[in-house]
Amino acid sequence: MATLELRNTSSVTPPVQLRNVVRQFGPQRVIDGLDLDIAAGEFVALLGASGSGKTTLLRTLAGLDDIDSGELRVPVARAAVFQEPRLMPWKSAWKNVVLGLRINDAKARAEAALTEVGLAHRLNAFPATLSGGEAQRVALARGLVREPKLLLLDEPFAALDALTRIRMHQLIIDLWRKHTPAVLLVTHDVDEAILLADRVIVLADGKLADDIRVDLPRQRDSGQAGFQSIRSRLLGLLGVKTQAADTATQEPARDVTLSALRRFANAR
């Protein structure tokens, strides 16, 4: 038996609860008896190999997919941002932001949301004229304008170049701090998960393989004490073997490059 409860009050804690949730396609259980809580205002990153159930879980939380059994409790006010911005090409940026909303002050609300993501000057721009990063920021504004208590992010940075990705990381953190939704970020990037999240959970075969608290001060950097130990643990859970030689040679070079990019992005 499946139970879905939509919550429209911010006083309920935690706003996201899953109890013994199952989602299956034919005989295959993609989500297999999952228990999970996400607290109000908590930023959770979700890792897992391809086919582990990450996107199915996000679609379930977004209301785009049903569960077969178990209990699922989520806020009514939810929004999802996907890897593809999914903008309507024949509508301007501001009309994409308020797509599907029936509100009197639609343009003003859209302009406020676009201002928050740094795109006030692109209010009337059409998707074909936007860069990849700009299009993704419009998609993010579309989520924000709905004032979600739960913001779902399905690999929204995967198609962006390194510098744009770092800027988007900082934008997401700034907006999360301002609006305080619970956030679930689906990603394949272990470093991204550690940099952004309060917790990192790992799915394997539709089950919770681990739930790791990231107790590192922000602003985070891969050179912080404790970062590499969390990284190694997560990579191990994902079946990636790390060798001392790799850590001593390849990773420092990568970390220096990423650190330099972050300094450059923050300086602009």
UniProtKB/Swiss-Prot annotation:
It comes from the Bacteria. GO terms for cellular component: plasma membrane. It is an enzyme of class 7 (translocase). It catalyses: ATP + H2O + aliphatic sulfonate-[sulfonate-binding protein]Side 1 = ADP + phosphate + aliphatic sulfonateSide 2 + [sulfonate-binding protein]Side 1. The keyword Cell inner membrane applies. Keywords: ATP-binding, Cell inner membrane, Cell membrane, Membrane, Nucleotide-binding, Translocase, Transport. PANTHER family: ALIPHATIC SULFONATES IMPORT ATP-BINDING PROTEIN SSUB, TAURINE IMPORT ATP-BINDING PROTEIN-RELATED. This is Aliphatic sulfonates import ATP-binding protein SsuB 2. It comes from Pseudomonas savastanoi pv. phaseolicola (strain 1448A / Race 6).
